[in-house]
Amino acid sequence: MAFLCETLERRVIPNWRSLSDTISNGELEYPQLENHVAFDLMEYEQEWSNNHSLLYASELVNAAVANGINDNSTAKNAAEYIVTCEGKTTDAQKSVAMSLLGSHNNEVILKSPHEIDELLMNTKDIYAKIGYYKSLIRKYPFNPINYVEAARFYVMIGQSRQAIEMMDIALALDSENRFVSRSAARLFVHVEDLDRAHYVLRKNEQVAFDPWLIASEISVNLLRDRSSSLIKNGIALINSGDFSPFSLTELTSSLGTLEFIKGTQKKSKLFFNKSLISPNDNSLAQAEWAKSNKLTLNFDREVCNKVNLSYEANALYAYQDNRFEDALKASIRWLNDMPYSKNPVFVGANIAYTFLKDYKTAAKILQRGLEANPNEPAFLNNLAYTYALDGKLIEANEIIHRINKVSEIGEKTRICLTATRGLIAYREKKIEEGRALYLEAIKAANNIADDPTYNWNAILNFIREEILATNIIPSDVETVLSQIHETPKDKGVKTLKQDILKLIAKGRTASFY
């Protein structure tokens, strides 16, 4: 049985992308914040003056943009040089340069969807990127951006310790930088150090005056089950008239989420609708999440369709609309955009194995997820489940053996793992063993009072395997199915019921063996 993705919670945690993508998304626009100490560009200016090359121009421009320095004439001169180097610059270099010159088009032209065969991470390329940023670090040891970029590539291949080491240096160099603070917070959320994620945000002296930082602080506190002391500051910024709707989108979204959790739907809708005036990909995905939890919101689809990098929101929207092929394509793009994140793996794989019965694609998505999260027990369980459904029992057992080496496994994942072992036993014609394991999983899942979907999924998987293995349709099966009252959100439960009803309609006269 797969660990369920339909019950996943979502918060407005900052998305961690490259500096150039963050700039393209408009998330580094800086108003004149109080007490802001300007970053010193002197070293970069001197290097550029002495060496008129693309490398030194890019370093100067990156440092200026990342620190909100938009009026430095030397940096603008370097940006103009980059733009004139047609055919020699990368898209990222040109994008950052144009943003400094004020001619950057904030509309990102999305690349075509990645083919699934390209999904598996090329670790050789990742190591090359790490090597590139380490060479820049040797040249510019006081530029925090290069450490942040290196950390992001480290975390893509599951090397969290090295990523944290890099991020610690970046924070030591410039803990006041929005890009550094938000990237660090996302990293520490990824490694489940929520207190550290909160600390780096609060340590930034601009947090009380910067809507992007307040949004992140409120959202991290929601993950910690704590109340934020900056809520009043955030509301004051919203009411000040000093910020554009886009600059406030994550803040209003995080406040909308807070009110939704408290049960004050009227306030929640007010904040969420403000976040949708000019959303980014994060606030749009949060609104889709709220809508899936029965909150009625004012979506302007013309506005939504123009949001840059909105793969997650597109996946959630298509999923709720039962357009599962579109949802899978968007999930794959979401995963390639943020390969360290767990949610696109859960969502994409679930769509593939539950609704499309595309087990090979599901397996590739889960394998990709395990590159960045090698010891995630839910990924391992879901991969074993996928292999078993696809008849690859040797591979399924190899994954089960790998799970046995994982020390920390949550209660819900253990229930899923017991059921998955039952599935494998059934497919190996060990019917009594499979039956016993499923009944054990059903009994354990029945104790999860706040989420009956685990119990329902265990029962439905059990019924399916009984019918497939024995060619016998239990006389009370339709009564059991009628007692499972799934909500519209429980799409996986509904699909499993439909799969069983199809078996019943066929009379189940043919075995899968």
Model-inferred region functions:
Residues A64-A66, L120, Y154, F188, ...:
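Residue at a conserved register position within TPR or TPR-like alpha-solenoid repeats
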Residues L55, H114, I145, R178-F179, ...:
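Start-of-helix register in tetratricopeptide repeats
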Residues S18-N50, E59, V65-G68, L110-S135, ...:
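Alpha-helical segment of the N-proximal tetratricopeptide repeat
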